[in-house]
Amino acid sequence: MVKETKFYDILGVPVTATDVEIKKAYRKCALKYHPDKNPSEEAAEKFKEASAAYEILSDPEKRDIYDQFGEDGLSGAGGAGGFPGGGFGFGDDIFSQFFGAGGAQRPRGPQRGKDIKHEISASLEELYKGRTAKLALNKQILCKECEGRGGKKGAVKKCTSCNGQGIKFVTRQMGPMIQRFQTECDVCHGTGDIIDPKDRCKSCNGKKVENERKILEVHVEPGMKDGQRIVFKGEADQAPDVIPGDVVFIVSERPHKSFKRDGDDLVYEAEIDLLTAIAGGEFALEHVSGDWLKVGIVPGEVIAPGMRKVIEGKGMPIPKYGGYGNLIIKFTIKFPENHFTSEENLKKLEEILPPRIVPAIPKKATVDECVLADFDPAKYNRTRASRGGANYDSDEEEQGGEGVQCASQ
């Protein structure tokens, strides 16, 4: 048992109707009562009712709720909550699904215009400190002379050919299907109005709009991120009966030579010498704030290649919550050149540094004594190519793989 049968009765189908039967019933009602075919108020009301009924009964989830709880149950389940008031918004969408694009009349009431989007480029320093830019915008505004009418007061008449819609519909029947095509009115050229040439506004020549150049101050706030939007509400092009869209500036962060950004944090790759890495010392870096940071490494703390450390509060500003992110330091170690010191000094290093790790080789294993040679990518690419192998892309790949010369013992 269903709680209510109202929507079924409107479409003239039983409560056991299939989806196909409901669709056919709505199609029949839409053809009969659509405002473009039947302009009477009674037909308009019946079309709204049929559209609301089909909106519910064509959706399995909404239909199930309606069957169990009636219209009251739909108000809490994203349903219509009764018939929609005013206009033919969603009913027209359903109608167009059956009969092709252009089934609906032009939407009533003011429409929203398109947004105007621009990219604003900013360096990491500018995103840290903030920046204000003055940008010129060429936009369309309502004519000040005629206040957007296009002519003298009382001289603008509604186009009788399209009934002020600016569009016309052509209906064709192709077999059992009806197709409707929407075209621009050839009398008013889509404006919906007729203005006698002698009464046209001399400033805009009846176009109702004119061009204006406006300067906008764009504030890039400290801590803004790549892709963030700065919106000027209602500053896009104006047109009669149109709500102006927005002017939107999209922040584009330029790459930095020293820093990378990770959310509110900054990442910096610091190269230090081997002595500083193992015995402590200092290094310095120029921060995006413009200040220099002197960073100390405590003696006794060993910095390994690729190790990461953090300096708290030296990242990017955090706009919503205040404070700053962190500065993450990733270390690379600059090793000395070959033969940088004497054998005597190397022996002293042996006494200072932890003992060497002795390789563990099984007693009965066959041992080859090998010597490392410098790796030359060009040389080994030629060798591999002659064997049909792949080339090395860089000297960072497979380091030393074929740079070992062995002599059997």
Swiss-Prot record:
Top-rank lineage group of the source organism: Eukaryota
Keyword Ligase: no
SUPFAM superfamilies xref list: Chaperone J-domain, DnaJ/Hsp40 cysteine-rich domain, HSP40/DnaJ peptide-binding domain
Underlying gene: YDJ1
Annotated zinc fingers (CR-type), start-end: 130-213
GO biological process, one term: 'de novo' protein folding
Cross-link Glycyl lysine isopeptide (Lys-Gly) (interchain with G-Cter in ubiquitin): residue positions: 198
Residues at which Zn(2+) 2 binds: 159, 162, 185, 188
Effect listed in the UniProt record for changing residue 335 to D: Prevents dimerization
Induction: YDJ1 is a heat shock gene whose expression increases moderately at elevated temperatures.
Residues annotated for Zn(2+) 1 binding in this entry: 143, 146, 201, 204
Gene3D superfamilies on file: DnaJ domain, Heat shock protein DnaJ, cysteine-rich domain, Urease metallochaperone UreE, N-terminal domain
Domain J: 4-72
Annotated stretches, region: Disordered: 382-409
Oligomer status and interactors: Homodimer. Interacts with HAP1. Component of the HMC including HAP1, SRO9 and YDJ1.
Keywords associated with the record: Chaperone, Cytoplasm, Isopeptide bond, Lipoprotein, Metal-binding, Methylation, Prenylation, Protein transport, Repeat, Stress response, Transport, Ubl conjugation, Zinc, Zinc-finger
Purpose: Probably involved in mitochondrial protein import. Is also required for efficient translocation of pre-pro-alpha-factor. Involved in heme regulation of HAP1, as a component of the high-molecular-weight (HMC) complex.
Miscellaneous section: Present with 119000 molecules/cell in log phase SD medium.
Name assigned to this protein: Mitochondrial protein import protein MAS5
Sites of Cysteine methyl ester modification: 406
GO molecular function: ATP binding; ATPase activator activity; Hsp70 protein binding; protein-folding chaperone binding; unfolded protein binding; zinc ion binding
Residues anchoring lipid (S-farnesyl cysteine): 406
Residue stretch(es) of the prosequence: 407-409
Location relative to the cell: Cytoplasm; Cytoplasm, Perinuclear region
Entry binding sites for substrate: 116, 135-137, 215-216, 247-249
